Amino acid sequence: HHRRGEDFVDSPILTYLEPAASSTVELVVELFEYQRVEIEVLPTEATVMYAGMLVDTNYFRNHVGSRTFQIASKLKEKQANVSRAYEFLQDDYKTTQEKMSISANAYRFGNDILIAYGNEEEIYTRPLLAKVGNELLNIAEIKAVFVAGRVDKDRIAISARSKTEVNVQLIMEKLGGGGHFSMAACQVEEKTVKETIDKLEEAIDQYLDERG
């Protein structure tokens, strides 16, 4: 459901791009209708797909349309366990501590953009960085959030989230990443967290200048 990037696979058997779709799950379930035989979906599979929609839409808050809820309804018809899907996404105590430590480093960049970052010595997962971004975006006056953290010894990832006014996809593309308007990401190699944040601030400034 992201638009085609520079690293798009060459000569695929099937290309199905729909940037307006809320999630990959939305596209997959739609394809079921075009098959010659009925696709059997087990309740556990439907539950996992429902959880995927929760992640991609930030619990049906971002980038959703009527089709999104139609697909969710179809998964429910396939016996998706909604309560279980939410349980899949709950954090344990250690993860919660890590999220809090990153959030504690958050600072405002301009009036309505928030940048948060992890400690230089710590290794984080990309899903954790995304979760921090989703949670910080709930702050009323904040329009976009960027969360940076080291994901291995050579790479730092940035997870970007926005509401309706800031196109984080364009900002992440300036750093070699991609995504869509309200949800995007990138990774930077062989840089410190501080150097990565500096590059991010430059990309944001450039985007704001271009937007006018």
What are the residue ranges of the model-derived segments?
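Histidine-centered active-site/metal-ligand motif
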Residues: 1-3, 179-180
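Short alpha-helices
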Residues: 2-72
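Hydrophobic helix-and-loop "lid/oligomerization" segment in the mid-to-C-terminal part
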Residues: 50, 55-212
